[in-house]
Amino acid sequence: LDRSSAASDVYKRQMLRRSLAGDQVERISGIVNGTTNFILDAMESTGASYDEALAEATRLGYAEADPTADVEGHDAASKAAIMASLGFHTRVKFEDVHCEGITKVTAADIAAANDAGYSIKLLAICERLQREDGSEAVNARVHPTLVPKEHPLASVSESYNAIFVEAEAAGSLMFYGNG
């Protein structure tokens, strides 16, 4: 973990802990891994294959020599567990987060999504759910997601990260920065 990534994660935690402390967060969705966002963005903007985009990410230093934790979604799942724990004032463990990576996303998938008005982004999604008995639960998951082009997260490019928060009093907020 490099210093810029660690600093970015600390900032995100502080944002959730302090900025929204008095508010009830309903949903947090975000692009929380710069490597996977770079790969998916390169596939969309240049038509590159997954392997070509990964090679470029490695060449530029965005991907590590072993990118498994990034491309399989494990890094994003760890961050989703932290976001859910902080945002919903509960304990969510890494093992509780459903996780799918981007290794099966093809250039054809990207093109079809683009033609339909979507971008594919690896999103960490954490949300408050109401059970039938009236109790609440928190769901956290990471997977490639079709994001409508008009949604702010669709415009997050290269290795940038963004967190989109939906809260009761604050409404919709987006926090954007280097991954």
Question: Where are these predicted regions, by residue range?
Answer:
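Single conserved hydrophobic/aromatic residue that forms the stacking wall/gate
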Residues: 1-7, 11
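Conserved phosphate-binding catalytic cores of ATP/NTP-utilizing and phosphoryl-transfer enzymes
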Residues: 12-16
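Conserved anion/nucleotide-ligand pocket segment
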Residues: 17-72, 76-78, 83
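Structured core elements
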Residues: 27, 39, 121-122, 141, ...
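Short beta-strand segments
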Residues: 29-33, 143, 166
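Substrate-binding/catalytic subdomain of NAD(P)-dependent oxidoreductase enzymes
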Residues: 53-155, 160-162
